[in-house]
Amino acid sequence: IFFILLAILTLQACNPKSADSSTTSASSQLWLVNMNDAQAQSVKDQKPILVYFTSSDTCGLCEQLETDIFSTPMFKEWAEKKVVLFKVDFSTLDQLPPGSQEQNTAMARSLKVSTYPTFWMLSVTHEVENGRFKIKPIGYTGYHPSPEKLIGALQNFVRR
């Protein structure tokens, strides 16, 4: 998995990002959509990356997460303190930033994600000698119906 993720990062680093590619819009403004941005934020803040795999226009449970969990003060406060939020969206609409489809497909393959919603927690370090990011998968989970249950499941993967 490490080498596949390293290949993703190398490919992503070669893709110029558009001005609007760093975060998603609407109800999930806290979610980054560019892996380079998520890695840099993770290293800077010394927090793991919470990767959220979704298909925002076809996944009913994902829509529920947006309204019932991600928009709650409880989830927002927990996420701000504990993780860097990164969304991998497989929307069929043409609303994804340039390069996102390739990045998202590579990430889903490397982590063997086949259903939505899926959450992966990743640890990221920056290797100064070669300038690359080193990613280590920590754990994963699926849908949980409340902020308390989702946070409880994710908290198992957070060190602090």
Briefly describe each language-model feature range:
Residues 68, 106-110, 114-160:
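Non-catalytic, surface beta->alpha helical segment in thiol-disulfide oxidoreductase systems
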Residues 11-13:
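C-terminal motif of bacterial Sec signal peptides marking the signal peptidase cleavage site
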Residues 31-49:
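A short beta-strand-turn-helix
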Residues 31-32, 75-102:
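Thiol-based oxidoreductase modules, predominantly thioredoxin-like and allied folds used
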Residues 62-78:
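Typically the conserved alpha-helix immediately C-terminal to a functionally engaged Cys/Sec
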Residues 1-9:
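Sec-dependent N-terminal signal peptides
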Residues 15-17:
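Bacterial signal peptide processing site
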Residues 45-59, 119:
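Short active-site neighborhood of thiol/selenol oxidoreductases, capturing the structured segment around
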